[in-house]
Amino acid sequence: ARKHTQYVQIFKNCGPSAGMSIRHSHWQVMGLPIVPRRAAVMAENMQEDDCLFCKMLTYEKEQKKRIAAETEHFLAITPYAGRFPYELWLAPKAHQRDFGDMNDAERKDLACLLWEMLQKVTSLKKDVGYNICVMDGPRNRDFHWHIEILPRIGGFAGFEYATDCFICMVSPERAARYYRGEAEE
């Protein structure tokens, strides 16, 4: 990394509704000289000795209502206050600062989980767009990396843009049931 790069964002836009501008499949990597506000706030709460993200994963595992899938090394959860219908986070169970810190077994486990979850995302509706964001920590800061999958169902309007508050029409519990393959009542 260059010395002026403070934050690196890895992402993929799939489909026109998700901002895809080039038709072939590709990932993008951007290095920023600043730390985005959301990443900075998250980093403040993810210190290894007192990681809010670790606590959230422990809570979700105990409650089981918002667990979409679980593997040996990862949890897939539908976040309590998601911004998008069927939003999904894939996170290592153990505290890991960087996406690059995985060993071979963890990489294989993540690849299988990501594939499984993307099959379900793309089955939500015909030609659904989605974004995949690898959320790594700011340079030289502790963090709990994770992947966010953001299906682009519905859209933002004036309220969301004006307030940075999101109205999500699908509860995270309902989304988790969908990802687990449970029939709706």
Residues covered by each model-derived region:
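HIT superfamily nucleotide-processing domains
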Residues: 1-185
